[in-house]
Design a protein with these regions (language model features):
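Sec-dependent N-terminal signal peptides
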Residues: 4-14
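Boundary at the C-terminal end of the N-terminal hydrophobic targeting segment
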Residues: 16-22
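A short, Trp-centered hydrophobic/proline-enriched beta-strand micro-motif
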Residues: 24-46
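Short, hydrophobic/aromatic-rich segments at coil-to-beta transitions
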Residues: 29-33, 57-62, 116-117, 133-138
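Hydrophobic/aromatic beta-strand elements that line small-molecule binding cavities or substrate pockets
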Residues: 49-54, 73, 150-154
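An acidic-aromatic
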Residues: 54-102
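Flexible, surface-exposed loop/linker segments and immediately adjacent secondary-structure boundaries
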Residues: 86-125
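Gly/Pro-enriched, hydrophobic low-complexity segments
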Residues: 112-156
Length: 156
């Protein structure tokens, strides 16, 4: 009896993880609107950025920030190209370390079947949770210990 219960729990847990992975992969295949809120608790200052997220058929990603400034990010397996639309400048950053860009890899290539809601990259922890079927939230502290929350919304 105890073994059967344990087996059922393991099957349920595996299904939950694969369902979460599949749901996240389906969610991030949509054109999304996002709001990123950064909260500096030391200074009690809050900043907000707004923009769009698009994953292309070739698995490249385009992120456009519309507020408070205008930037466009083109992300592929080799580089991140940043267009500062206000100053008409372009900066290219090569992607050398795939561990550094694990979150980008998941967004581009898909979340693994055994994914839970946490990613650890160089001691930074990212929590990814569904708020509801149309909203996903990513929470993390950046390298300056500022709390960041990015909420992605499906465009309906």
């Amino acid at each position: 009896m105890k073994d059967k219960l344990l087996s059922l729990l393991l099957i349920f847990a595996t299904n939950c993880f694969s369902d979460t992975s599949e749901q996240l992969n389906n969610f991030f295949n949509n054109e999304l609107f996002f709001i990123q809120t950064s909260i500096n608790k030391l200074n009690n200052i809050s900043d907000e950025s707004k923009g769009t997220y698009i994953k292309n058929d070739d698995k490249s990603i385009v992120i456009e920030i519309n507020s408070p400034f205008r930037e466009k990010y083109f992300i592929n397996n080799n580089e991140i190209k940043i267009h500062d639309l206000d100053f008409n400048q372009i900066k290219k950053i090569p992607i050398n370390d795939k561990n550094e860009t694990m979150l980008i890899n998941f967004l581009s290539d898909g979340f693994p079947k055994n994914f839970n809601n946490k990613i650890t990259i160089n001691e930074k922890i990212f929590f990814i949770d569904f708020i509801n079927e149309n909203t996903v939230q990513i929470k993390f502290k950046d390298n300056m210990q500022i709390d960041n929350v990015i909420k992605f919304y499906k465009n309906d």
